[in-house]
């Protein structure tokens, strides 16, 4: 399978400010470390591999993985932006999915329910809101905050929930191919990501064991603090991740920086097209990377075990 994506909107001239041994170093970017690591042999146009443009390959591969997972297991993957700056959503994607599971007696989320949830997420875009989220009120407030911040020539951090439902159980390995480690590497390794949490994430640090342990009955787990992963292996519960992005590094405000020869300067961005909030566009890439890791884990499970069709725990 081969794919080619052509860009007709490139503006290479916007990067002249950063080119050559006297080029200016953008705070928050990889300019300085890439310049010295490559001994000066680096093409700054478009940001290269450090650009979010390169994740189009993830989306192409992820679209194929999603088809495979949906056909074999009914797996569906969703994302919802849940924080912009200090503003947090009051409705969570994981919570919406818990409601669907409760309606289905804790088993699988039906194709109809998956389609309805996807339609609800897409509806936010059709109404003119720029955010893909399950919380409509949050979307309107966050859109206003992003617009105001752009006018101030600044940027905002953000966070997204990424959730997979109808996930096959028993995939992943307890050590070197731990699905938790692979997901944290894949999602956490995405450009500008500063944190990747599984399940209840950092909230578990304030809990007692009696609060955090998920009760188990013969029909399955009664809660999902573990986020669908225990010991690097899936339990069949929804796979829940939260990914945090730093504010966009490219801003027009004056900043202290240096040239590549370490001459100190007051840096000002001269040209460029930059989003004030990275999380607005990141959802589809996170969904795609999650799909790729899940499909990879399924294929590894089938390659290593005799009972290759066993994907159930309860």
Question: Language-model segments: which ranges?
Answer:
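Glycine-rich, N-terminal phosphate-binding loop and its surrounding beta-alpha-beta segment
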Residues: 1-33
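Short acidic, glycine/tyrosine-flanked loop/strand segments centered on an H-E-D-like triad
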Residues: 20-48, 256-274
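Glycine-rich, mobile lid/loop segments that gate access to catalytic sites or pores
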Residues: 36-172
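Glycine-rich anion/phosphate-binding loop at the beta-strand->alpha-helix junction
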Residues: 59, 152-265
């Amino acid at each position: 399978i081969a794919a080619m994506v052509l860009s007709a909107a490139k503006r290479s001239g916007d990067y002249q400010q950063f080119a050559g041994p006297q080029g200016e170093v953008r705070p928050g970017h990889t300019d300085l470390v890439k310049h010295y690591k490559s001994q000066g042999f680096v093409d700054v146009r478009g940001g290269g591999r450090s650009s979010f443009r390169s994740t189009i390959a993830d989306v192409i591969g992820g679209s194929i993985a999603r088809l495979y997972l949906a056909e074999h297991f009914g797996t569906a993957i969703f994302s919802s932006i849940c924080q912009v700056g200090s503003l947090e959503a009051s409705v969570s994607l994981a919570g919406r999915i818990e409601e669907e599971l409760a309606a289905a007696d804790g088993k699988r989320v039906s194709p109809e329910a998956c389609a309805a949830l996807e339609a609800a997420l897409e509806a936010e875009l059709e109404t003119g809101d720029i955010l893909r989220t399950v919380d409509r009120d949050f979307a309107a407030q966050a859109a206003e905050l992003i617009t105001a911040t752009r006018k101030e020539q600044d940027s905002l951090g953000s966070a997204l929930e990424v959730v997979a439902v109808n996930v096959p159980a028993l995939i992943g390995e307890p050590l070197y191919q731990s699905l938790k480690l692979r997901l944290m590497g894949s999602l956490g390794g995405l450009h500008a990501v500063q944190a990747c949490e599984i399940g209840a994430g950092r909230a578990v640090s304030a809990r007692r064991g009696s609060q955090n342990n998920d009760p188990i009955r013969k029909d399955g787990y009664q809660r999902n603090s573990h986020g669908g992963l225990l010991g690097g292996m899936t339990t069949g519960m929804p796979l829940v991740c939260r990914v945090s992005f730093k504010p966009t590094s490219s801003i027009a405000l004056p900043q202290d920086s240096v040239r590549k020869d370490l001459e100190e300067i007051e840096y000002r961005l001269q040209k460029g097209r930059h989003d004030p909030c990275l999380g607005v566009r990141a959802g589809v890439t996170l969904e795609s990377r999650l799909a790729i890791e899940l499909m990879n884990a399924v294929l590894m499970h089938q390659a290593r075990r005799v009972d290759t069709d066993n994907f159930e725990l309860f």
